[in-house]
Amino acid sequence: MSKIFRYECRRLLLSKFFFGLAAVTCFYGWQVLEHVTILGIAHTASFSPWSFGDYLSRLLPLLWLGTLFSVSVYTNGAERRAAMLTQAAPMHPAVYRLARFLCVLTASALLSLAAVFTAVCFYARMFRWHDWGTLVLPALVTLAPALLFAAGGGWLIGYMRVWLLVPWALFPFLSAALPLPEALGLWNGKLFSTRPLLLPSLDPAFSLSPETIVMQCALALAGAGLFFWAALKK
């Protein structure tokens, strides 16, 4: 499986389109940092975990699109026809599907790291701030569940009909426009601008409500479940 994974990663990550996505992510991220994040969020510093989380929530739709691009590489018509060859190979087809799904997650993680690295460079340049450890938790809880959900759902519907990835790509944009409850506030970024005002201290540490934690865990599990459902159907 490791050989399949390395081969598929090279095929996906060394494509011109992936490098283009990474460049667009860094450029758009810098614009958000320079024009929005620098103002601070909910009376917190521009480099606070709350402001950083708001920055990531604004980049989430773009990272979602990047994840679905990776999914489309393995669910388009040509790949599905080529799957007939892998089904005749001695290795179980589920191994190929799992290796490719891990490649999708790897690509999504690298795009997310590009967004995080852009913020790290911005904070170091503008504020001489280097306490990067405080950014790990908001990055994980904001991006990991959502992108796993994007990949799992995209894998399922992409194998059903690849064009269904287009409406699935609109999901984060729709979520950003809706008045969601606090448990889903990470999707539209409202949690980062409202929750600090509800906490007692002036510069509160990053924290989430139990409802939000449960919802993010449910999204991550749903993403994994959707992939395995699609794998079993094949």
What is each model feature region?
Residues 85-94:
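Short helix-to-coil transition segments within interhelical loops
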Residues 34-50, 168-234:
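Terminal transmembrane helical anchor/hairpin motif
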Residues 82, 104, 108-117, 212-226:
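N-terminal hydrophobic signal/anchor transmembrane helix of membrane proteins
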Residues 23, 27-73, 98-168:
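Secretory targeting signals
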Residues 65-83, 154-162, 218-234:
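Transmembrane alpha-helical segments in integral membrane proteins
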Residues 1-24:
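Aromatic- and glycine-rich beta-strand/loop motifs that create alpha-glucan
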Residues 5, 9, 13, 93-105:
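Interfacial transmembrane-helix starts/ends
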